Regions:
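Membrane-proximal HAMP signal-relay module
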Residues: 1-55, 70-77, 82, 112, ...
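Short alpha-helical segment of the dimerization/phosphotransfer core of two-component systems
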Residues: 95-100
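Conserved micro-motifs of the catalytic ATP-binding
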Residues: 115-120, 153, 157-161
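A conserved beta-strand-to-alpha-helix junction within the catalytic ATP-binding
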Residues: 121-139, 192
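Short helix N-cap motif at coil->helix boundaries in the Bergerat
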Residues: 127, 215-226
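Short conserved segments within the C-terminal catalytic ATPase subdomain
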Residues: 141-151
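Short helix-loop "hinge" at the ATP-lid/N-box region of the Bergerat-fold HATPase_c
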Residues: 176-177
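Glycine-rich ATP-binding loops of the HATPase_c
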Residues: 257-264
Length: 284
């Protein structure tokens, strides 16, 4: 009993004091076990915190347009809105309804990407063609924001999921338009990686989205791909951004083992985001 107790006691002490595990004395044979348990505990706590923050952010983001819709519709229903205001109120309801729908779609998509299976419908596709289609889809939005969009480069074949690539390029370009300045530019370039960097892997492909927008300071650059994180909240509100576009981009890149994501930016000068694809015919 004494021997059993002497073995179990440090483990029980550890279980009761996970947050102060460094101060708990254990046999040297148990040190790797303690380190593993501590890391797992930290991962669980971090994920729990992220879930709580995400839930709080979702609640806030959903509440804002719903409050606006409820307020304007109540004024119309009660007859308190003047005839000349009804059309304007209806336009606000329509705008906030669209914002709400976009937000819900993005939340659902993020949830789907969290559960994406490896090797899910990956195929060889032309990323230049996808970028070209995206530019055509967003021309009206770019014109509305007084932003010029141009596509450069050459046709390049990569191995990827087609739907995800459509979403990746769309979200990168949409973000570059929304956070640009009137009279600004968005340049999308698809080319071999060596065209950007002579030391890059031969055969690799890069898609680059570069804008002349507000830019991102150093302290914000690591967090810009987090869900609902916004550098300029007032700009997001005025442009209708959900704060989830770049989070979706990060998830899509993570789902492709042959892809990597990088960002360079300077406040007042703009942002450049690159997604690089290694030369692979499969994701093994």
């Amino acid at each position: 009993h004494f021997l059993t107790g002497s073995i179990i006691e440090p483990i029980e002490n550890l279980a009761d004091n996970l947050d102060a595990s460094d101060s708990v004395k254990v046999y040297k044979e148990l040190v790797p076990f303690v380190q593993t348990i501590k890391k797992q505990h930290e991962d669980i706590m971090r994920n729990a915190t992220m879930r709580q923050e995400f839930t709080a952010n979702v609640s806030h983001e959903l509440k804002t347009p719903l409050t606006s819709i409820s307020g304007y519709s109540e004024l119309i229903e009660s007859g308190m809105a003047a005839d000349e205001d009804i059309v304007r109120f209806a336009a606000e309801i329509h705008k906030n309804s669209n914002r709400l729908l976009t937000l819900i779609n993005d939340i659902i998509r993020l949830s789907e990407l969290d559960q994406v299976e490896e090797h899910n419908c990956f195929e060889e596709l032309d990323i230049y063609d996808i970028a070209q289609n995206c530019v055509e889809m967003l021309r009206l939005s770019a014109k509305k924001h007084d932003v010029t969009m141009e596509l450069h480069g050459v046709h390049r074949i990569i191995c990827a999921n087609r739907q995800m690539m459509d979403e990746l390029v769309y979200n990168l370009c949409d973000n570059a338009i929304r956070y640009n300045n009137p009279g600004g530019r968005v340049d999308i370039t698809v080319d071999a990686a060596v065209a950007f960097d002579k030391t890059a892997e031969t055969g690799a492909t890069i898609i680059e989205v570069k804008d002349t927008g507000i830019g991102i300071s150093k302290e914000h650059q690591e967090r810009i791909f987090e869900r609902f994180y916004r550098v300029d909240k007032s700009r997001s509100k005025s442009t209708g951004g959900t704060g989830l576009g770049l989070a979706i981009v990060k998830h899509i890149v993570a789902a492709h083992k042959n892809a990597s994501l990088s960002l360079t930016s300077e406040p007042g000068k703009g942002t450049c985001i690159r997604v690089a694809f290694k030369m692979k015919t499969n994701l093994e």
